[in-house]
From Swiss-Prot:
It comes from Camellia sinensis (Tea plant). The keyword Aminoacyl-tRNA synthetase does not apply. Keywords: Magnesium, Metal-binding, Methyltransferase, Transferase. The record marks 149, 221, 265, 313, 328 as: Involved in substrate discrimination. Belongs to the methyltransferase superfamily. Type-7 methyltransferase family. S-adenosyl-L-homocysteine binds at residues 18, 61, 66, 98-99, 134-135. Pathway: Alkaloid biosynthesis. InterPro entries: MeTrfase_7 (IPR005299), MeTrfase_capping (IPR042086), SAM-dependent_MTases_sf (IPR029063). Caffeine binds at residues 25, 152, 155-156, 317. The lineage of its organism: Eukaryota, Viridiplantae, Streptophyta, Embryophyta, Tracheophyta. One of its GO terms (biological process) is methylation. This is Probable caffeine synthase 5. Mg(2+) binds at residues 173, 259, 261-262.
């Protein structure tokens, strides 16, 4: 099965769903709202007299309440600018994008209960539609978007990195599912190469879709360290690999399935992201910063409660692609193992996560 068919967050609204276990990305989105507000204000300052409608896309929207916050923030800022500039009523067209496997039903069910859609009596009329497809390619007509937003999505790769088997067909990243301290250099290079290729495709597609002077607000999980095997970027996948390895030892998973599985994700450094944007040359970097955050689970004093909540959050975004490789029937055992490993080996300590915030403007010309 291709990545685009297996990569999505846990569906529905149950106890293991992404909708119920996305508090960390909600925290990140909340902290970066001032950046989005400033981006909307900047759009009006550039060419507000030309605006009749603002076309916006949220790429990789999943089913998180983040999407509702993004729409409400943009709508509120548009209403504010309309009052300040005494301009005509504007329309807000929002496209919600994710891969076809995303639970758009749950997304729109929540959206209709939280965001006023299509109300002509408001200063800004809001219209929303879903756009399934991969953001690594074109999704919209040329020069049709003024604002692109994406939170914790652009780090996902279009496929597992190429070149992770030897000439003899042997796995080069044995007993691991991502970069680790024991991974050979070729694994690190393969992951960076795949991210470079995919993020370049992402930028190229958006450069055709975004109008001149339009902008993008991108938030990615990343790392402060230059070392891609640092714990801040490898924590989740490293411990899941250990948990899967224990299930292999118990005969519940075939070892070959572990050795041949590599997660299609990459946590870049700020320097790597900056280098790719500058090499592409379609956008200027208006703002770029990295910041660290504790996970919300760290607020829990009891380490078992803390880690059990962490395991649910991890399960919400990893289970679909993990179960596609290893089978649905062992998922409960796997995440129980994950919980036990974090508590027993790390005493419930969870490293901080680095987020990269990037504001890009489309170059005129």
């Amino acid at each position: 099965m291709e990545v685009k068919e297996a990569l999505f967050m846990n569906r529905g609204e149950g106890e293991n769903s992404y909708a119920q276990n996305s508090s960390f990305t909600q925290k990140v989105a909340s902290m970066t709202m001032p950046v989005l507000e400033n981006a909307v204000e900047t759009l009006f300052s550039k060419d507000f007299h030309l605006l009749q409608a603002l076309n916006v896309v949220d790429l990789g929207c999943a089913t998180s309440p983040n999407t509702f916050t993004v729409i409400s923030t943009i709508k509120r800022m548009m209403e504010k600018k309309c009052r300040e500039l005494n301009c005509q009523t504007l329309e807000l067209q929002v496209y919600l994008n994710d891969l076809p496997g995303n639970d758009f039903n749950t997304l729109f069910k929540g959206l209709l209960s939280k965001v006023v859609v299509g109300n002509k009596c408001e200063e800004v009329s809001c219209y929303v539609m879903g756009v399934p497809g991969s953001f690594h390619g074109r999704l919209f007509p040329r020069n049709s978007l003024r604002l692109v937003h994406s939170c914790y999505s652009a780090h996902w790769l279009s496929q597992a990195p190429k070149g992770l088997t030897s000439r003899e067909g042997l796995a080069l990243n044995r007993r691991k599912i991502y970069i680790s301290k024991t991974s050979p250099l070729v694994v690190r290079e393969a992951y960076l190469s795949q991210f470079h290729e995919d993020f370049t495709m992402f930028l190229n597609a958006r450069s055709q879709e975004v109008v001149p002077n339009g902008c993008m607000v991108l938030i990615l999980p990343g790392r402060q360290s230059s070392n891609p095997s640092s714990m801040e970027s490898c924590f989740t996948w490293e411990l899941l690999a250990i948990a899967i390895g224990e299930l292999v030892s118990q005969g519940l998973i075939d070892e070959d399935k572990l050795d041949t599985f590599n997660v299609p994700s990459y946590f870049p450094s700020l320097e790597e992201v900056k280098d790719i944007v500058e090499r592409d040359g379609s956008f200027t970097i208006d703002h770029m910063v990295g910041f660290e955050l504790d996970t919300p689970q760290m607020q829990e004093n009891d380490k078992w409660v803390r880690v059990e909540k962490l395991a649910k959050a991890v399960r919400a975004f990893t289970e679909p692609i993990i179960s596609n490789q290893f089978g649905h029937e062992i998922m409960d055992k796997l995440y129980d193992k994950f919980t036990y490993i974090v508590v027993s080996d790390l005493e419930g300590k969870i490293p901080k996560t680095t987020s990269i915030v990037l504001v890009l403007s489309k170059i005129i010309g």
